[in-house]
Regions:
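Membrane-embedded alpha-helical segments of multi-pass transporters/permeases
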Residues: 22, 26, 53-56, 92-100, ...
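Interhelical loop/hinge segments that connect adjacent transmembrane helices in multipass membrane
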Residues: 3, 135-138, 162-164, 169, ...
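Membrane-water interface segments that mark the loop-to-transmembrane alpha-helix transition
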Residues: 6-17, 43, 48-99
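Membrane-interface helix-loop junctions in multi-pass transport and translocation proteins
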Residues: 29-37, 101-109, 132-135, 142, ...
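Alpha-helical transmembrane segments of multi-pass membrane proteins
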Residues: 49-53, 97, 102-128, 204-207
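Membrane-interface junctions at transmembrane-helix termini in multi-pass inner-membrane proteins
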Residues: 65, 70, 117-141
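Signature of the first transmembrane helix
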Residues: 2-59, 148-149, 169, 173, ...
């Protein structure tokens, strides 16, 4: 029964992911020119490479470890998340240097998209996936995405709202990640960053990352 419920939650979310762009795309393309959307797409593609560095293979590895060691969730979580946080800080530092020293990156869209890196650094959905709590993940993602779409229709009105549009996309993504930390506290307790335990997880994370990529 639990497997069927998890499948239903995941299926409903995937349907939402398909439907929402169908709703927003005509509206967005009517407001912004192909050049504006191309600018967003270009910088977003660059940020994606830094996100890959920030996340490593943590999502896959973290899910596996949490699922396999449910009696020691707190220790495993903070060891893995410490690794994720270090990778995110490194990635964000490199992205900042790129924006500062490469003229082609000195664009407000590129700056705003830096929030996406921070957002991925806060992502702990792998904890709930390991616990097989797909209901919470689906509810969180659905709520945030719907609010994001509503905000676009409410606030994005003219071609001059491109920066606002990009900000809303990244802001609600970040809000969604932050919203998972409160329910996570019952499993992970207070923050406990553990460099020694993070080193233990480093090699398997890199191995999984190389296989996945």
């Amino acid at each position: 029964m639990k497997v069927l419920k998890n499948y239903a939650y995941n299926l409903s979310y995937q349907l939402l992911v398909i439907v929402l762009p169908i709703i927003t795309t005509p509206y967005v393309t009517r407001i912004f020119s192909s050049k504006d959307l191309g600018t967003y797409g270009y910088f977003n593609s660059i940020v994606t490479y830094f996100i890959l560095l920030a996340t490593l293979g943590v999502a896959n590895y973290g899910t596996k470890e949490i699922s396999a060691h449910r009696k020691d969730i707190r220790k495993n979580f903070w060891g893995i998340y410490t690794l994720q946080l270090i990778a995110t800080i490194l990635s964000l530092a490199l992205y900042t240097l790129l924006c500062l020293f490469f003229p082609g990156m000195q664009n407000m869209v590129a700056y705003i998209l830096g929030l996406s890196l921070i957002s991925k650094g806060m992502d702990i959905s792998w904890l709930f996936q390991g616990l097989e709590d797909f209901r919470r993940i689906t509810a969180r993602n659905t709520t945030v995405k719907v609010l994001g779409v509503i905000s676009i229709f409410l606030f994005v009105k003219t071609p001059g709202d491109l920066y606002l549009y990009v900000f809303l996309l990244t802001f609600f993504e970040l809000l969604g990640q932050l919203s998972m930390w409160l329910p996570a506290r019952s499993y992970i307790g207070d923050p406990h960053f553990d460099l020694s335990y993070a080193r233990i997880h480093l090699k398997p994370v890199i191995l999984i990352s190389s296989v996945v990529n």
